[in-house]
């Protein structure tokens, strides 16, 4: 794997590359992501022909809030590559559907969960949440309870939306276990 990692670093001219746990990690940019994916797929020494997944991560405290990770697998060499792409909130990464057909659903999931829009995607719409859903549930600032309750109304015979109604206020719980009482008391006396 060391040879493959060095070869990839030499050819892609990535600023940073790391490896561990049988996975090579490359940091790409918006301008180079398509070229890097094409190289990794088509180069005879790489042959990362399978896009396993594209997933997002939300880092609200970072200047570049989002990170996209493209998970590639070379079945021939039994090696994985993760290509990480850091994005500002308003960045639109290019769709890679023309490079990997499987990217279509992965990009739709990232859009649905994080609100990241992919330029030139052939069918960018929600895939996991309802079409009327407000917001993107994997964002760290999305409320835990959501904005609306969705339920099936038997009488109306349709799905209805209601504002969230939580009859009980949020409470903080004491994390000490009552079963630790005697042990905790004995330890504090020492």
UniProtKB/Swiss-Prot annotation:
Q: Which UniProt keywords apply?
A: Cell membrane, Membrane, NAD, Quinone, Translocase, Transport, Ubiquinone
Question: Topologically, how does it sit relative to the membrane?
Answer: Peripheral membrane protein
Q: Where in the cell is it found?
A: Cell membrane
SUPFAM superfamilies attached to this UniProt entry: Nqo5-like
Q: Which InterPro entries match?
A: NADH_DH_suC, NADH_quin_OxRdtase_su_C/D-like, NADH_UbQ_OxRdtase_30kDa_su, NADH_UbQ_OxRdtase_CS
GO-annotated cellular components: plasma membrane
Principal subcellular localisation of the protein: membrane
Q: Name one GO molecular function term.
A: NADH:ubiquinone reductase (non-electrogenic) activity
Q: Name one Pfam family in it.
A: Complex1_30kDa
Reaction(s) catalysed (UniProt annotation): a quinone + NADH + 5 H(+)(in) = a quinol + NAD(+) + 4 H(+)(out)
Check the record and name the NCBIfam families matching this protein.
Answer: NuoC_fam, PRK06074.1-5
Q: What does this protein do?
A: NDH-1 shuttles electrons from NADH, via FMN and iron-sulfur (Fe-S) centers, to quinones in the respiratory chain. The immediate electron acceptor for the enzyme in this species is believed to be ubiquinone. Couples the redox reaction to proton translocation (for every two electrons transferred, four hydrogen ions are translocated across the cytoplasmic membrane), and thus conserves the redox energy in a proton gradient.
Quaternary state and interactors? NDH-1 is composed of 14 different subunits. Subunits NuoB, C, D, E, F, and G constitute the peripheral sector of the complex.
To which protein family does this belong?
Belongs to the complex I 30 kDa subunit family.
What protein is this chain from?
A: NADH-quinone oxidoreductase subunit C
Organism of this sequence: Wolbachia sp. subsp. Brugia malayi (strain TRS)
């Amino acid at each position: 794997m060391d040879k493959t990692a060095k070869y990839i670093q030499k050819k892609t001219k990535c600023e940073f590359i790391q490896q561990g746990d049988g996975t090579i990690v490359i940091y790409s940019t918006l301008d180079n992501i398509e070229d890097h994916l094409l190289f990794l797929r088509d180069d005879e020494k790489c042959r990362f022909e399978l896009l396993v997944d594209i997933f997002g991560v939300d880092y609200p405290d970072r200047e570049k809030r989002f990170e996209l990770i493209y998970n590639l697998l070379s079945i021939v060499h039994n090696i994985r590559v993760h290509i990480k792409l850091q994005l500002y909130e308003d960045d639109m990464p290019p769709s890679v559907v023309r490079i990997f057909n499987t990217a279509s659903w992965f990009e739709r999931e990232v859009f649905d969960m994080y609100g990241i829009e992919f330029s030139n995607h052939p069918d960018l719409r929600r895939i996991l949440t309802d079409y009327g859903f407000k917001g993107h549930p994997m964002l760290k600032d999305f409320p835990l309870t959501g904005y609306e309750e969705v339920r099936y109304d038997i009488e109306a015979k349709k799905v209805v939306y209601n504002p969230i109604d939580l009859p009980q206020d949020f409470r903080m719980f004491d994390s000490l276990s009552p079963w630790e009482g005697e042990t905790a008391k004995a330890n504090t006396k020492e």
